[in-house]
Each structure stands twice: as C-alpha cells, then as structure tokens.
Amino acid sequence: MALLEICCYSMECALTAQQNGADRVELCAAPKEGGLTPSLGVLKSVRQRVTIPVHPIIRPRGGDFCYSDGEFAAILEDVRTVRELGFPGLVTGVLDVDGNVDMPRMEKIMAAAGPLAVTFHRAFDMCANPLYTLNNLAELGIARVLTSGQKSDALQGLSKIMELIAHRDAPIIMAGAGVRAENLHHFLDAGVLEVHSSAGAWQASPMRYRNQGLSMSSDAHADEYSRYIVDGAAVAEMKGIIERHQAK
C-alpha cells in the first residue's frame, strides 16, 4: 500500500496528521519559504509526543541549495542533533554551482546521519540532469527522493516521476507538490509508492486586536494574521483513497 507522508509545521499539526492516518511526518518550519529547519524546542516536543516516524527537514534558509561554508557547518550540526534526538530519518539536499549534487558535502551529511534514512528533498527538482543526479543519490545511499518531476506541481511532472521510478536501482521516488485528494488517484494508478502532501489550509489567527498599519515581514502585503495548519479531514480522506485503491 502506498505510504502517505504529511508535511507539518508544528507539533500540533504532526499530532493531527498522526491521528488521521498519516504514515510519516516531514517536520518543517516556515511554510512560506518552502520549509526550513525546525527549532530545537519543536524537535524535542514532537519527539516526545508523536509516535509515527518523523523526518525533520535540514535546510538553513530559503532560496537555492548551494550553501556557504557557514551554512553547511550549521547543516551538519543540525543533522547530528536530529540523530542524537533519536529521529529515524531526515530530509535535506545540497547542490553545487552547476546544479549537480554536491557529492563531497552530501558524503559528509551521510556520514553524520549514520543509520538515519535520508530523503533528498526538492533540491532534486532544481538539478541540471535528473537521471545523472539519481545515480549519484543511489551511490550515496539516499533512501528516497522527494520530487515534483521538475515541474511546478507533481501532476504536471508525473511522466518524469514515472521515468524516475523505472530507473534501475533508484531510491524510492516520493511524489510531492500539489498532491491532494482530488488528484491522488493519478499517482496511485501510476505506481507511485510514496506520496507527500501538506494536506493543509490557512487558518485565521485568533487575535482580536490587529495593528493593520504595521508588518513584521519584509513583504508588506503578507498576511500575518493567518497560519498554515494540517487539515485532519484532508489527511483522512487521502488515507481512505489509498486504502480503497489497495483493496481493488
């Protein structure tokens, strides 16, 4: 049966995902940046309360995946922290200036991760040559690759995802970006074994007082009185679709 991973941005969302049938959680901060490394406090609280597998993302900033020496040092330290806390896996990825996997740095990450299952995240979708990259990731011992098939959403990239799945000795290919209940059957019919979804929605802040003339964001148009949460009903619906597909 296909595995359902839910992207979560808080301990509460991870619990919601677990309670509604998620098989695994990708734990992140900063949804508007596409996911950054969660704080130590969030990592500890999730580790204490969530019982399904949780894989934190290790990504020090938004933007590209080519990092300075200082940023890479922080990545390695975060990898060690996640390992010490007892998480079963993590999610990360580093590219070089030419859009290839930075093999020397990824080898250091894999050494620091030790027995943890490492997912190479959507840095894969920014690489120059996906099949060459897939061979490199297999050589590194990467457990899985999260990808939209190098398109803006995974449904548009489904043909590429199928090509990657068919590639000999490839890591597990997990489809993600825009995967929802209404299009999930396309991925299941294509033989995708793992799917990744935020299964979420923006929820209004409970604050009654709002200083509309002031923003804490560099984006003056950002809505700072909303937060992204996992929709438990959406998770349960996706899990039900997977179970019914398996029963066919």
From Swiss-Prot:
It comes from the Bacteria. The keyword Cytoplasm applies. It is found in: Cytoplasm. Keywords: Cytoplasm. GO terms for molecular function: copper ion binding. Pfam families: CutC (PF03932). InterPro entries: CutC-like, CutC-like_dom_sf. One of its GO terms (cellular component) is cytoplasm. Gene3D superfamilies: Copper homeostasis (CutC) domain (3.20.20.380). Belongs to the CutC family. NCBIfam families: PRK11572.1. Homodimer. This is PF03932 family protein CutC. It comes from Escherichia coli (strain 55989 / EAEC). The gene is cutC.
